[in-house]
Amino acid sequence: PGLVDIHFHGCAGHDFSDGTPEALQAIGAYELRQGVTSICPASMTLSEETLKTVCANAYAYTKRPEAEQDTGARLIGIHLEGPFISMEKKGAQNPAYIRNPDVEMFLRLQEAAHGLVRLITIAPETDGAKEFIRRLADQVHISVGHTCSDYETAYRAFSQGADHVTHFFNAMPPFTHRAPGV
């Protein structure tokens, strides 16, 4: 048994969002050498077409020939860390591609990934987030992150099916006694 990494963007000079087979091979090999046997890398906020390519190549990585299976960490899922996030709490995400939660776009990305998207970060205060969570919580883990959400909005998101937080206390309002936030 080894470690499982569910939030990293890249390593060994490559980024998961490079979306190339070479990047995935290098990332998988590096992670395995570090004792990480299973990975769920996070994407950046990119165009839909680029995200489709990233998703398709991630799926292709899971279908490597048997002889190559032991050369890299097992890719157990994709974490879409955008584009359905808050502009105000975007962090290093590209603002040009930030958009409101869109069920149909997610389904297109999931189709490109052959169902490999396991986790998606959204800002629950954005238009469309409530419907997104309601419709997709039984199909994918929904993570609250890159958000300006207050406590009540976050509570509703978790009540509706969100079940994870992306880098808690980072890219969200600070925790205070009068405004506990996420």
Name each model-derived stretch.
Residues 9, 25-54, 72-86, 113-125, ...:
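Divalent metal-dependent hydrolysis catalytic cores, especially in the metallo-beta-lactamase
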Residues 20-23, 54-57, 102-104, 178-182:
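Charged helix-capping and loop-helix junction motifs
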Residues 51-69, 132-141:
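Short, electropositive alpha-helical surface patch
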